[in-house]
Amino acid sequence: MSRRTEQVIGVWGELVLLAKKLPKANFSEIAKLAMDIQSLHQICCEGNSVACVLGRRWLMNYICSKQAVLSSKFAPCCELPEPFRGECIITSENDDTPDLSPLPLSRFTEDPFICKQTPAKQDDSLQEFLYEYSRRHPELAVPVILRVDTVYQNLLGKCCKLENPLECYSHGEEIFQRVVHDSHERVKNLCDLREKLGDRSFHDRLIVLYTKKAPQLSTQELVVFTKNMAAAASKCCPLNDELQLACMEDSAKLMLGALCRRHETEPINAGVGHCCDDSYAFRKPCFDDLQVDGTYISPPLSCDKVINLKEDLCKAQEQEFQTEKQRFLSHLVKQKPHAAEMKFQSIIVDFAHLVERCCQAEKSEMCFQKEGSKLIEKCQSLLGS
């Protein structure tokens, strides 16, 4: 992703956050603040600590001087000294949403002259659409709103090439609703899967899915990444539909952002690269839909090298045992990404039962040696099939 693209995403992401937080503020104030905050981020990230502190102080002074038109929630914060004032403003709750009319479609999907605007004017119009949509949908996560905005931009790009563009883009509102519905459905399906499988088996399923998508990652990286995904699902899935969507989208944004930074440092594969670089707004759906990496050639694997059948397993904490089991599962998937999932699960279940049985045996080590050979044989049979 280019530096210019990152800056645009940064400004537009800030604009969404600000429009949700300050729904009573007008567009010009929100657009100015978004630019100022993004510029301050850049200064601070470049390591200029003096300019960063001064810039932050100036920004908070400006916000407090404009609190009457920005937010009714800032008054207690603006009475505090620095640095408490800034932290208070950032963590303050969203202002009460005013009684807004429906999205002014006459300006965005019913205006016959949209395509005749200059590029600069069209860019302003797109930002204003983002502002108007965001303040009307405080319940939606930033990535979902950016998804709607991306679809709107693509719609105009396609329709403005036609003889009758208005007829083409006048269906915009239905398309926006489909984007939100699709985002809801993806999260609902994930949460339904977790409920059906239970937490442990759900994490195992994530191991299988993401090992297929990114087999170049080490088994440890895959275990940690999917553990974070499973934890996010445990936190978000019990929430109601609206909160569930926002919670999962925000969590995925952070986790996939970390994965993409890993890819930037040490490339994983073309599929991951495509999802990271192509569209920030559609990053999560892209990863959801990513299939088996057919280019990956796994180094030869001997089952006795990856199946840890030693007495110290009996002393392991439950989490350590689960991690060992999931590493084994990831190794198997790397070898046979197209094998039926039931075959993986069969070996994993046998592994768990063997550990339980041998740990209860009087001579655990002897049990592991005797019973373990059968498991290794079954494992080698899968790899050889």
Sequence positions of predicted segments:
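General marker for long, soluble alpha-helical cores
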Residues: M1-S385
